[in-house]
Protein backbone atom coordinates (compact mmCIF):
# COMPACT_ATOMS: atom_id res chain seq x y z
CA UNK A 1 0.00 0.00 0.00
CA UNK A 2 1.33 3.44 -0.92
CA UNK A 3 0.02 6.98 -0.56
CA UNK A 4 -1.78 8.67 -3.45
CA UNK A 5 1.01 11.27 -3.72
CA UNK A 6 3.65 8.54 -4.00
CA UNK A 7 1.64 6.77 -6.71
CA UNK A 8 1.15 10.06 -8.59
CA UNK A 9 4.89 10.79 -8.43
CA UNK A 10 5.78 7.35 -9.80
CA UNK A 11 3.30 7.64 -12.67
CA UNK A 12 4.73 11.04 -13.65
CA UNK A 13 8.38 9.94 -13.57
CA UNK A 14 8.28 6.46 -15.09
CA UNK A 15 6.94 4.71 -18.17
CA UNK A 16 4.14 2.12 -17.96
CA UNK A 17 6.55 -0.73 -18.76
CA UNK A 18 9.19 0.30 -16.20
CA UNK A 19 10.59 -2.35 -13.83
CA UNK A 20 11.46 -1.84 -10.17
CA UNK A 21 13.51 -3.71 -7.60
CA UNK A 22 11.73 -4.05 -4.27
CA UNK A 23 13.78 -4.27 -1.09
CA UNK A 24 11.95 -5.61 1.95
CA UNK A 25 14.15 -4.51 4.83
CA UNK A 26 12.94 -6.77 7.61
CA UNK A 27 13.94 -9.79 9.67
CA UNK A 28 11.96 -12.75 10.94
CA UNK A 29 11.81 -12.78 14.72
CA UNK A 30 11.13 -16.22 16.22
CA UNK A 31 10.10 -14.51 19.46
CA UNK A 32 7.57 -12.29 17.73
CA UNK A 33 3.84 -12.57 18.21
CA UNK A 34 0.50 -12.23 16.45
CA UNK A 35 -2.48 -10.92 18.37
CA UNK A 36 -6.11 -11.73 17.69
CA UNK A 37 -9.40 -11.33 19.53
CA UNK A 38 -11.66 -14.26 20.45
CA UNK A 39 -14.99 -14.40 22.27
CA UNK A 40 -17.04 -17.54 22.91
CA UNK A 41 -20.73 -17.76 23.85
CA UNK A 42 -21.60 -21.24 25.06
CA UNK A 43 -24.71 -22.96 23.70
CA UNK A 44 -26.79 -25.90 24.91
CA UNK A 45 -24.99 -28.18 22.44
CA UNK A 46 -21.30 -28.77 21.79
CA UNK A 47 -21.56 -27.75 18.13
CA UNK A 48 -20.45 -24.23 17.22
CA UNK A 49 -20.96 -21.52 14.61
CA UNK A 50 -17.77 -19.61 13.75
CA UNK A 51 -18.01 -15.86 13.08
CA UNK A 52 -14.76 -14.41 11.75
CA UNK A 53 -13.73 -10.94 10.62
CA UNK A 54 -10.42 -9.20 10.02
CA UNK A 55 -8.65 -6.01 11.04
CA UNK A 56 -5.29 -5.31 9.40
CA UNK A 57 -5.18 -2.45 6.83
CA UNK A 58 -5.18 0.97 8.50
CA UNK A 59 -7.63 3.74 7.59
CA UNK A 60 -10.12 1.76 5.45
CA UNK A 61 -13.67 2.10 6.75
CA UNK A 62 -15.62 -0.49 4.74
CA UNK A 63 -12.85 -3.01 4.13
CA UNK A 64 -11.46 -2.96 7.68
CA UNK A 65 -13.81 -1.42 10.24
CA UNK A 66 -17.28 -2.51 9.09
CA UNK A 67 -16.72 -6.22 9.75
CA UNK A 68 -15.43 -5.80 13.32
CA UNK A 69 -18.19 -3.26 14.12
CA UNK A 70 -20.95 -5.65 13.03
CA UNK A 71 -19.19 -8.57 14.74
CA UNK A 72 -18.91 -6.70 18.05
CA UNK A 73 -22.61 -5.82 17.76
CA UNK A 74 -23.41 -9.51 17.26
CA UNK A 75 -21.45 -10.38 20.40
CA UNK A 76 -23.33 -7.74 22.38
CA UNK A 77 -26.66 -9.08 21.09
CA UNK A 78 -26.13 -12.83 21.46
CA UNK A 79 -24.34 -12.81 24.82
CA UNK A 80 -27.70 -11.90 26.37
CA UNK A 81 -29.51 -14.80 24.65
CA UNK A 82 -29.92 -18.50 25.35
CA UNK A 83 -28.67 -20.32 22.26
CA UNK A 84 -28.59 -23.92 21.03
CA UNK A 85 -25.23 -23.80 19.26
CA UNK A 86 -22.14 -22.10 20.62
CA UNK A 87 -20.96 -18.91 18.90
CA UNK A 88 -17.22 -18.47 18.47
CA UNK A 89 -16.19 -14.96 17.38
CA UNK A 90 -12.71 -14.23 16.01
CA UNK A 91 -11.16 -10.89 14.97
CA UNK A 92 -7.82 -11.45 13.22
CA UNK A 93 -5.36 -10.04 10.69
CA UNK A 94 -6.56 -11.29 7.30
CA UNK A 95 -4.93 -14.45 5.86
CA UNK A 96 -1.96 -14.85 8.22
CA UNK A 97 -4.33 -14.46 11.17
CA UNK A 98 -6.73 -17.12 9.90
CA UNK A 99 -3.85 -19.50 9.14
CA UNK A 100 -2.34 -18.94 12.61
CA UNK A 101 -5.70 -19.39 14.33
CA UNK A 102 -6.40 -22.61 12.42
CA UNK A 103 -2.89 -23.92 13.18
CA UNK A 104 -3.43 -23.38 16.89
CA UNK A 105 -7.04 -24.61 17.07
CA UNK A 106 -7.50 -27.10 14.20
CA UNK A 107 -8.67 -30.09 16.27
CA UNK A 108 -11.17 -28.02 18.23
CA UNK A 109 -12.48 -26.32 15.10
CA UNK A 110 -12.95 -29.48 13.03
CA UNK A 111 -14.57 -31.25 15.99
CA UNK A 112 -17.08 -28.53 16.92
CA UNK A 113 -17.65 -26.01 14.10
CA UNK A 114 -20.33 -27.03 11.59
CA UNK A 115 -20.79 -23.73 9.73
CA UNK A 116 -20.15 -20.01 10.02
CA UNK A 117 -19.62 -16.62 8.43
CA UNK A 118 -16.68 -14.49 7.36
CA UNK A 119 -17.91 -10.88 7.64
CA UNK A 120 -16.29 -8.15 5.53
CA UNK A 121 -17.20 -4.96 3.63
CA UNK A 122 -20.68 -4.62 5.17
CA UNK A 123 -20.85 -0.84 5.68
CA UNK A 124 -21.70 0.51 2.22
CA UNK A 125 -25.21 0.92 0.79
CA UNK A 126 -24.93 -1.31 -2.28
CA UNK A 127 -26.58 -4.70 -2.80
CA UNK A 128 -25.64 -7.73 -0.69
CA UNK A 129 -23.17 -10.42 -1.73
CA UNK A 130 -22.37 -13.81 -0.30
CA UNK A 131 -19.80 -16.43 -1.29
CA UNK A 132 -20.96 -19.97 -0.67
CA UNK A 133 -18.79 -22.52 1.09
CA UNK A 134 -16.70 -24.86 -1.06
CA UNK A 135 -19.30 -27.64 -1.32
CA UNK A 136 -22.28 -25.25 -1.21
CA UNK A 137 -24.08 -27.33 1.42
CA UNK A 138 -23.33 -25.50 4.65
CA UNK A 139 -26.19 -24.39 6.94
CA UNK A 140 -24.78 -20.86 6.67
CA UNK A 141 -25.15 -21.02 2.86
CA UNK A 142 -28.83 -21.91 3.21
CA UNK A 143 -29.68 -19.53 6.05
CA UNK A 144 -28.18 -16.38 4.52
CA UNK A 145 -30.05 -16.91 1.26
CA UNK A 146 -33.30 -17.73 3.07
CA UNK A 147 -33.05 -14.47 5.03
CA UNK A 148 -32.18 -12.34 1.98
CA UNK A 149 -35.09 -13.87 0.06
CA UNK A 150 -37.56 -13.43 2.91
CA UNK A 151 -36.53 -9.79 3.33
CA UNK A 152 -36.83 -9.33 -0.46
CA UNK A 153 -33.35 -7.82 -0.66
CA UNK A 154 -31.26 -7.66 -3.80
CA UNK A 155 -28.19 -9.88 -3.64
CA UNK A 156 -25.52 -11.65 -5.65
CA UNK A 157 -24.71 -15.28 -4.92
CA UNK A 158 -21.18 -16.44 -5.79
CA UNK A 159 -19.55 -19.85 -5.73
CA UNK A 160 -16.29 -20.66 -3.98
CA UNK A 161 -14.22 -19.97 -7.10
CA UNK A 162 -14.84 -16.26 -6.40
CA UNK A 163 -13.19 -16.53 -2.96
CA UNK A 164 -10.60 -14.01 -1.81
CA UNK A 165 -10.87 -13.47 1.93
CA UNK A 166 -10.45 -15.78 4.94
CA UNK A 167 -12.98 -18.26 3.57
CA UNK A 168 -9.95 -19.50 1.57
CA UNK A 169 -8.38 -20.80 4.77
CA UNK A 170 -11.46 -21.95 6.68
CA UNK A 171 -12.69 -24.03 3.72
CA UNK A 172 -9.30 -25.37 2.66
CA UNK A 173 -8.50 -29.08 2.41
CA UNK A 174 -8.12 -30.60 5.86
CA UNK A 175 -10.17 -27.82 7.49
CA UNK A 176 -13.52 -27.61 5.63
CA UNK A 177 -15.55 -25.68 8.22
CA UNK A 178 -18.34 -24.71 5.80
CA UNK A 179 -17.78 -20.96 6.10
CA UNK A 180 -19.87 -18.50 4.05
CA UNK A 181 -18.57 -14.98 3.33
CA UNK A 182 -21.08 -12.15 3.76
CA UNK A 183 -20.61 -8.65 2.27
CA UNK A 184 -22.39 -5.72 0.70
CA UNK A 185 -20.02 -4.74 -2.13
CA UNK A 186 -17.65 -7.64 -2.72
CA UNK A 187 -14.05 -6.97 -1.75
CA UNK A 188 -11.78 -6.04 -4.71
CA UNK A 189 -14.78 -5.26 -6.95
CA UNK A 190 -15.88 -1.79 -5.82
CA UNK A 191 -14.08 1.39 -6.99
CA UNK A 192 -13.27 2.58 -3.46
CA UNK A 193 -11.55 -0.69 -2.50
CA UNK A 194 -7.99 -0.21 -1.17
CA UNK A 195 -8.09 3.53 -1.85
CA UNK A 196 -8.45 6.63 0.32
CA UNK A 197 -12.09 6.82 -0.85
CA UNK A 198 -12.89 3.92 1.48
CA UNK A 199 -13.51 6.39 4.29
CA UNK A 200 -16.28 7.35 6.71
CA UNK A 201 -18.21 9.06 3.90
CA UNK A 202 -18.48 5.71 2.13
CA UNK A 203 -20.12 3.85 5.04
CA UNK A 204 -23.15 4.66 7.17
CA UNK A 205 -24.79 3.60 10.42
CA UNK A 206 -27.91 2.72 8.42
CA UNK A 207 -26.01 0.28 6.18
CA UNK A 208 -24.15 -1.26 9.13
CA UNK A 209 -27.47 -1.76 10.95
CA UNK A 210 -29.04 -3.37 7.88
CA UNK A 211 -26.08 -5.74 7.53
CA UNK A 212 -26.22 -6.54 11.25
CA UNK A 213 -29.90 -7.48 10.97
CA UNK A 214 -29.31 -9.78 8.00
CA UNK A 215 -26.46 -11.70 9.64
CA UNK A 216 -28.24 -11.74 13.03
CA UNK A 217 -31.36 -13.23 11.46
CA UNK A 218 -29.24 -15.78 9.59
CA UNK A 219 -27.56 -16.91 12.82
CA UNK A 220 -30.92 -17.08 14.61
CA UNK A 221 -32.32 -19.18 11.76
CA UNK A 222 -29.47 -21.67 12.16
CA UNK A 223 -30.03 -21.64 15.93
CA UNK A 224 -33.72 -22.50 15.45
CA UNK A 225 -33.10 -25.51 13.21
CA UNK A 226 -32.12 -29.10 13.96
CA UNK A 227 -29.19 -30.60 12.02
CA UNK A 228 -29.13 -34.38 12.60
CA UNK A 229 -25.79 -36.14 12.29
CA UNK A 230 -25.48 -39.91 11.88
CA UNK A 231 -23.41 -41.53 14.62
CA UNK A 232 -22.47 -44.72 12.76
CA UNK A 233 -20.69 -45.70 9.57
CA UNK A 234 -22.77 -47.46 6.87
CA UNK A 235 -26.44 -48.47 7.23
CA UNK A 236 -27.63 -49.80 10.60
CA UNK A 237 -29.48 -53.08 11.16
CA UNK A 238 -32.90 -51.72 12.15
CA UNK A 239 -34.75 -54.95 12.93
CA UNK A 240 -33.02 -55.49 16.27
CA UNK A 241 -33.83 -51.90 17.25
CA UNK A 242 -37.61 -52.48 17.14
CA UNK A 243 -38.34 -49.22 15.33
CA UNK A 244 -41.72 -50.19 13.83
CA UNK A 245 -44.05 -49.48 16.80
CA UNK A 246 -42.36 -46.16 17.59
CA UNK A 247 -42.58 -44.50 14.18
CA UNK A 248 -45.99 -43.01 13.42
CA UNK A 249 -46.14 -42.90 9.61
CA UNK A 250 -49.68 -43.63 8.51
CA UNK A 251 -50.49 -45.42 5.26
CA UNK A 252 -46.98 -46.75 4.66
CA UNK A 253 -45.91 -50.36 4.57
CA UNK A 254 -43.17 -51.68 6.83
CA UNK A 255 -40.74 -51.80 3.90
CA UNK A 256 -41.47 -48.17 3.00
CA UNK A 257 -40.94 -47.05 6.59
CA UNK A 258 -37.59 -48.82 6.69
CA UNK A 259 -36.54 -47.09 3.47
CA UNK A 260 -37.57 -43.69 4.87
CA UNK A 261 -35.43 -44.16 7.96
CA UNK A 262 -32.44 -45.23 5.88
CA UNK A 263 -32.99 -42.25 3.56
CA UNK A 264 -33.15 -39.96 6.62
CA UNK A 265 -29.82 -41.33 7.88
CA UNK A 266 -28.16 -40.85 4.48
CA UNK A 267 -28.87 -37.11 4.60
CA UNK A 268 -28.06 -36.73 8.30
CA UNK A 269 -24.57 -35.34 7.78
CA UNK A 270 -24.93 -32.23 9.94
CA UNK A 271 -25.53 -29.94 6.97
CA UNK A 272 -29.21 -30.60 6.23
CA UNK A 273 -31.84 -29.44 8.73
CA UNK A 274 -35.05 -31.41 9.31
CA UNK A 275 -37.07 -29.38 6.82
CA UNK A 276 -34.57 -29.92 4.03
CA UNK A 277 -34.32 -33.64 4.82
CA UNK A 278 -38.12 -33.82 4.84
CA UNK A 279 -38.26 -32.26 1.38
CA UNK A 280 -35.42 -34.42 0.09
CA UNK A 281 -36.91 -37.77 1.17
CA UNK A 282 -40.48 -36.67 0.29
CA UNK A 283 -41.84 -37.11 3.80
CA UNK A 284 -44.16 -34.91 5.88
CA UNK A 285 -42.32 -32.68 8.32
CA UNK A 286 -44.24 -34.12 11.29
CA UNK A 287 -43.23 -37.64 10.23
CA UNK A 288 -39.62 -36.55 9.76
CA UNK A 289 -39.61 -35.18 13.31
CA UNK A 290 -40.90 -38.55 14.59
CA UNK A 291 -38.08 -40.34 12.77
CA UNK A 292 -35.55 -37.91 14.25
CA UNK A 293 -36.87 -38.34 17.80
CA UNK A 294 -36.69 -42.12 17.51
CA UNK A 295 -33.18 -42.15 16.03
CA UNK A 296 -32.06 -39.70 18.71
CA UNK A 297 -33.51 -41.99 21.40
CA UNK A 298 -31.56 -45.02 20.15
CA UNK A 299 -28.44 -42.89 19.60
CA UNK A 300 -28.16 -43.35 15.84
CA UNK A 301 -28.11 -39.55 15.37
CA UNK A 302 -27.04 -36.61 17.48
List each model region and its residues.
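N-terminal hydrophobic/helix-forming segments and targeting peptides
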Residues: 1-302
Amino acid sequence: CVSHEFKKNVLEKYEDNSFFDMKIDTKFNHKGNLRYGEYFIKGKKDKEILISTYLCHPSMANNELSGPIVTMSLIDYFKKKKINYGLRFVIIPETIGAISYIHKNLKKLTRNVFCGFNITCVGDSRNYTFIKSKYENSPSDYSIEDVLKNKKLKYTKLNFLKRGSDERQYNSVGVNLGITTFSRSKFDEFPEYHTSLDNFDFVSIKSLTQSFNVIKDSIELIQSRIYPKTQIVCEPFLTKRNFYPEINIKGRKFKDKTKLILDFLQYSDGNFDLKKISKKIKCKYSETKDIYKYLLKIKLVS
